[in-house]
Amino acid sequence: MKIPEAVNHINVQNNIDLVDGKTNPNKATKALQKNILRVTNSSSSGISEKHLDHCANTVKNFLRKSIAAQSYSKMFSQGTSFKSLNLSIEAPSGARSSFRSLEHLDKVSRHYISEIIQKVHPLSSDERLLLSIIINSNFNFRHQSNSNLSNNILNIKSFDKMQSENIQTHKNTYSEDIKEISNHDFVFFGVEISNHQEKLPLNKTHHTVDFGANAYIIDHDSPYGYMTLTDHFDNAIPPVFYHEHQSFFLDNFKEVVDEVSRYVHGNQGKTDVPIFNTKDMRLGIGLHLIDFIRKSKDQGFREFCYNKNIDPVSLDRIINFVFQLEYHIPRMLSTDNFKKIKLRDISLEDAIKASNYEEINNKVTDKKMAHQALAYSLGNKKADIALYLLSKFNFTKQDVAEMEKMNNNRYCNLYDVEYLLSKDGANYKVLEYFINNGLVDVNKKFQKANSGDTMLDNAMKSKDSKMIDFLLKNGAILGKRFEI
């Protein structure tokens, strides 16, 4: 097992360069030109299948690199957090992003490696051994979702790409993430230490959150991925009582259970979240773990970490207790090398929010369940599922009346169907279907939330011009509260 000499050398920056292996930014371009020239020169004598595969892979790798450059350009140029930390770059002047953003990622990664090396240098023999174990460990990357993302091929798309393709599904990316770190063109993964003998996955939550009933696991990283030690936006490690494997630590250790809750950050304060490229990520994890162990007053925990025979599961427990590792792949992952593991059943509402048609069809087998499903669709503003259900089942006005009487659906308990059809963010196409097919009365006054209002009141409040125009054309009037 080999440890980079950088961790024990006095000249930190020089050795950072050794760890990173500074590359010629034109190397990929020159290699591509060389391969294209080779193909051109050999065209007269025929091209072997081996050469065709090589050329195809060269083009594929070039495209993958170009896409990654676009994702990083967006993140580093638009994220306000990077600007405040003086880690931003200028937005590309043209439509395409240059590879400069990838070079910037490497520079940022080297910066954070250098920063942590300066904190922990020099290492003891126990620390060197632990670092070597981490550096030589294999990782699994886990993406959880209630969506059905695979059919022999696993396809996971970033939030930004799904938006560009008008794909409607439950989102875990919010406006604050986009504004501050602008990493919404990446696919997110939890990280765990690979152990071929243990049942996968080792963890089922990330940052205390259960992101879905399906775990999609890959054992290969991306040359253009990046890792953070925590959730990139929320870098606070939660208290021990929120951890998935809390009993392991509460039963075995004392002081460390009170030490773990903290912000993980760099030298510029708690908003300074360390970022490591794929090449540096194991080194970054190991050095930051050593820094935490040094500060811990828990002797039992320290001895446990420095056990030379530590097994992969125990190492994973430590790393995902001290940190909450998050790995990010630019824009999209598409692979046939993966495992899909169902962790639990998916509720009907979660299946609807995730646009999981397979699960919906398995659960909605009669009109009674269709009532539930339609109510969940309207409550969650899932127009795609609502229109799908309306096309599959012959809904009548009586069905709508029965929906409103359901006492086991919170949306129907709190709201009239007319309110759900016209609330802020509702899709006017669904409203159009209901009115055109006589399923609701255009001027029925709400009996539950906002009692006395009508659908036109809701549309006016949200300033939905399409919905307002459609309602007015169908004779809609305002409710009593707005009458003069």
Curated annotation (Swiss-Prot):
It catalyses: L-arginyl-[protein] + NAD(+) = ADP-riboxanated L-argininyl-[protein] + nicotinamide + NH4(+) + H(+). This is Arginine ADP-riboxanase OspC3. Keywords: ANK repeat, Host cytoplasm, Lyase, NAD, Repeat, Secreted, Toxin, Virulence. It comes from Escherichia coli. NAD(+) binds at H143, Q144, S145, N155, K157, T169, N172, T173. It is an enzyme of class 4 (lyase). The active site is at E326. It is found in: Secreted; Host cytoplasm. Gene3D superfamilies: Ankyrin repeat-containing domain. Belongs to the OspC family. One of its GO terms (molecular function) is toxin activity. ANK repeats lie at residues 369-398, 413-444, 451-480. Changing H328A: In EH/AA mutant; abolished arginine ADP-riboxanation of host CASP4/CASP11. Its EC number is 4.3.99.-. The keyword Lyase applies. The keyword NAD applies. ADP-riboxanase effector that inhibits host cell pyroptosis. Acts by mediating arginine ADP-riboxanation of host CASP4/CASP11, blocking CASP4/CASP11 autoprocessing. This prevents CASP4 activation and ability to recognize and cleave GSDMD, thereby inhibiting LPS-induced pyroptosis. ADP-riboxanation takes place in two steps: OspC3 first catalyzes ADP-ribosylation of target Arg, and then initiates a deamination to remove one N-omega group. One of its GO terms (cellular component) is host cell cytoplasm. It holds the Pfam family Shigella_OspC. Its main location: secreted. The record marks H143, F188, F211, D231 as: Important for catalytic activity. It comes from the Bacteria.
